[in-house]
From Swiss-Prot:
Belongs to the enolase family. This is Enolase 1. (2R)-2-phosphoglycerate binds at Q164, E208, D322, R376, S377. It comes from the Eukaryota. Pathway: Carbohydrate degradation; glycolysis; pyruvate from D-glyceraldehyde 3-phosphate: step 4/5. Keywords: Cytoplasm, Disulfide bond, Glycolysis, Lyase, Magnesium, Metal-binding, Nucleus. Mg(2+) 2 binds at D243, E296, D322. It comes from Entamoeba histolytica (strain ATCC 30459 / HM-1:IMSS / ABRM). Its cofactor is Mg(2+).
Length: 436
């Protein structure tokens, strides 16, 4: 059960950018984890260490992070017991010594943290999801509702859409296998609808496997989704979730939100620039006309007053904090104190250790918040989050469209888990009630 070897290397993610992979060897074998990275990153996230050498990968290399594992973290882990997850995570945090993992890199630390956990699961002879449940004291497990990002905008696409993700969520399915089939069929129908309206080029896919047709705005994107859902025969069984990533179209100086940020100034309708009340009215109007269940990052990451107003007045929506919370227990506590949202997005690389991730999830579950596990736009073949979402009973996951292998590997792993567990319940309409 003690660590015999730690080795890191630089690999490429799904966007062709470097990322880090860490291997930990024990008497049970070798355990490997790959770390993802995001495109729209919150300013409060832990530091993803990049080399900054413009002559190599445009400055995005991770050789420093690799070296930190191989020369600093690795030697400190040798001989340690992999069953002591919290102790080893704490040791790595202290080894770094900063409050944002800026010295060694959250990417370096997380790769080690995940591989330690995998090694421990093997030590116990358990599948990863069962070990994660045992490690965190979760007695119940539920198959999550998958949220598929099928229309892309914002930082993920070259169209005029300011908001970043439009997702389909099969809450009316009876099990995970059926949910995946419903989404895949709807995705294929969406492709047909988009091709007919915008031409073949509009069916090219973005970083997360979704389409990026040249729509004029959110309503046009939502109309496409409703049409595709109806065409697939799933009206009333598939709901819609949005990730607005509003920090990306917020103007710090004017304190306004520009829904036409990506439209040339001479062609832009001035009414697309909204104050907080105007943007809230926009969201409420979407909710009246479309089956919208969940809205992520509806406001900028430090516009606390707007978050509070929306949550107090319109908490019937699931209001998800991503850039606002960055999977950080301290930020989650602030949001609870300010009543700023009612759900948390979990991205393990935003915080950099599993122990801190577990703490964030526990806080949210004890408060009765929704918990949604998430991929990043720069992904790998690593399936850790699929086991995490089941083991910690999160009930929701978003990991892209049913397209591109780095997305599908997570969904396929969830199908394997459901098959293995047999009669495990599916979250369905109960997806917002995460339980500790």
């Amino acid at each position: 059960m003690s660590i015999q070897k730690v080795h890191a290397r630089e690999i490429l993610d799904s966007r062709g950018n470097p990322t880090i992979e860490v291997e930990i060897t024990t008497g049970k074998g070798m355990f490997r984890s790959c770390v993802p990275s995001g495109a729209s990153t919150g300013v409060h996230e832990a530091v993803e260490l990049r080399d900054g050498d413009k002559k190599r990968y445009g400055g995005k290399g991770v050789l420093k992070a690799v070296e930190n594992v191989n020369t600093i973290i690795g030697p400190a882990l040798l001989g340690k017991n992999v069953l002591n997850q919290a102790e080893l995570d704490e040791m790595m945090i202290k080894l770094d010594g900063t409050n944002n993992k800026g010295k060694l890199g959250a990417n370096a630390i997380l790769g080690c943290s995940m591989s330690i956990c995998r090694a421990a699961a093997a030590e116990k002879g358990l599948p990863l999801y069962k070990y994660l449940a045992e490690l965190t004291g979760h007695k119940e497990m539920t198959m999550p509702v998958p949220c598929f990002n099928v229309i892309n905008g914002g930082a993920h696409a070259g169209n005029a859409l300011a908001m970043q993700e439009f997702m389909i969520c099969p809450t009316g399915a009876t099990n995970f296998h059926e949910a995946l089939r419903m989404a895949a069929e709807t995705y294929q129908c969406l492709k047909v609808v988009i091709k007919a309206k915008y031409g073949q080029d509009a069916t090219n896919v973005g970083d997360e496997g979704g389409f990026a047709p040249n729509v004029s705005g959110a309503r046009e994107a939502l109309d496409l989704l409703v049409e595709a859902i109806a065409k697939a025969g799933y009206t009333g069984k598939i709901e819609i979730a949005m990730d607005c990533a509003a920090s990306e179209f917020y103007n710090e100086e004017t304190k306004k939100y520009d829904l036409g940020k990506k439209i040339p100034a001479d062609k832009k309708d001035p009414s697309l620039v909204k104050d907080v009340d105007g943007l809230i009215a926009e969201y409420v109007d979407y909710g009246k006309h479309y089956p919208i269940a969940s809205i992520e990052d509806p406001f900028a990451e430090d516009d606390w007053a707007a978050w509070n107003k929306f949550t107090v007045e319109h908490g019937n929506f699931q209001i998800v904090g991503d850039d606002l919370l960055v999977t950080n227990p301290a930020r989650v506590q602030m949001a609870m104190d300010k009543n700023a949202c009612n759900s948390v997005l979990i991205k393990v690389n935003q915080i950099g250790t599993l122990t801190e991730t577990f703490k964030t999830i526990k806080m949210a579950q004890e408060k009765g918040w929704g918990v949604m596990a998430s991929h990043r736009s720069g992904e790998t073949e690593d399936t850790f989050i699929a086991d995490l979402v089941v083991g910690l009973n999160c009930k929701q996951i978003k990991t892209g469209a049913p397209c591109r292998s780095e997305r599908l590997c997570k969904y396929n792993q969830l199908m394997r888990i459901e098959e293995e567990l047999g009669n495990i319940p599916y979250a369905g309409k109960n997806w917002r009630n995460s339980t500790a």
